[in-house]
Amino acid sequence: VGSEMCIRDSLYFYPKDMTSGCTAQACNLRDNYSELRKAGYEVIGVSVDNEKSHQKFIEKNNLPFPLIADTDKKLVEQFGVWGEKSMYGRKYMGTFRTTFIINEEGVIERIITPKEVKTKDHAAQIL
């Protein structure tokens, strides 16, 4: 109290709206949003889904933070989180679930990698 709050962006990249893991992650961040804000974090989600999909995802899950529709894949490529994935033996291009903590000067302070992200407890990882 009385000191200036340092705002950090928690820019989290996720594969797809309405999927189980992405919904669990978004809802965990939603449920802990006030605690994240008190600690000086702004939460911003990014996926390659379009704005209409994001709006449905926000409304269905009552998300209090913005989602960026990176339909041209500029952000996922710039942050290095777009690449070949595989599921059930099928290879495809997709987003690696990754979170970047960016300070007020725009410098990446910390990266929570795809192997580290816990979708159901992600807010605690950020804090």
Give the predicted meaning of each segment:
Residues 1-7:
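Short, small-residue-biased leader/transition segments that mark boundaries at the very start
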Residues 3, 35, 90-92:
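Short secondary-structure boundary/capping segments
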Residues 10-11, 43:
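Hydrophobic beta-strand anchors of alpha/beta hydrolase catalytic cores
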Residues 14, 49, 70-71, 118-121:
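Short beta->alpha linker loops
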Residues 18, 23-66:
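Structural microenvironment flanking redox-active thiols in thiol-disulfide oxidoreductases
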Residues 44, 55-96:
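Short, internal strand/loop/helix patches
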Residues 93-127:
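Thiol-/selenol-based redox modules, centered on thioredoxin-like
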